[in-house]
Each structure stands twice: as structure tokens, then as C-alpha cells.
């Protein structure tokens, strides 16, 4: 399924992408010539951006971007596992209480980083 881009900022209810589609895009970006700049533009968990106050035990082990609109929230990017494996992580919630998913997502990031 192709993503639908409305205004380029991601702040439109007319824009859409599936979790699978976003994951594929992140995998493709990893092998792209612009990968270093792309990844460095993403906040580091526990260090900067909207995840600087994350309670993750693995601060510094992930480059993740958050996004939210009323009744929806998302988290996507790359997590470095303890084994040296790098993982693509995508989480999306579309619900009136979508922000409540953040606690579970913190646990998901920690679990992934521990792998």
C-alpha cells in the first residue's frame, strides 16, 4: 500500500501510511546514500527531542521519531540491540486514548534494545 502525503509536514488527517509501509520505508532508508543524514536527524532516546525524558534503561540505543494528532500517536525508527543487531521499530495507535500507549512503547523499546 502506498503512503498518502497531503502537505509534507505529517500534520494532516488526510495523510496515511500503514505500520508495515513505514517499516519498509525505514528499511529502504537504511540502505540509502542519505542514511547517515537521515538517522542523525532523528532524536536519540533519552538524549534529545520528544523522547529526551524517556524512562528507557537504554538511553542512547535508539533513534526514534514520535508523532501525534488528536486520537492518534506513533513511534518509529531504529533501535540498536545489545547483540549488535539493529532493528526497525514502528508502533501506531489510533484511539481516543492513544497517548496511553506510550508506556507500553517505552517497554517495547527497552525489550528491543535488550535483544
Residue ranges and their predicted role:
Residues 1-115:
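Small-residue-rich helix-loop
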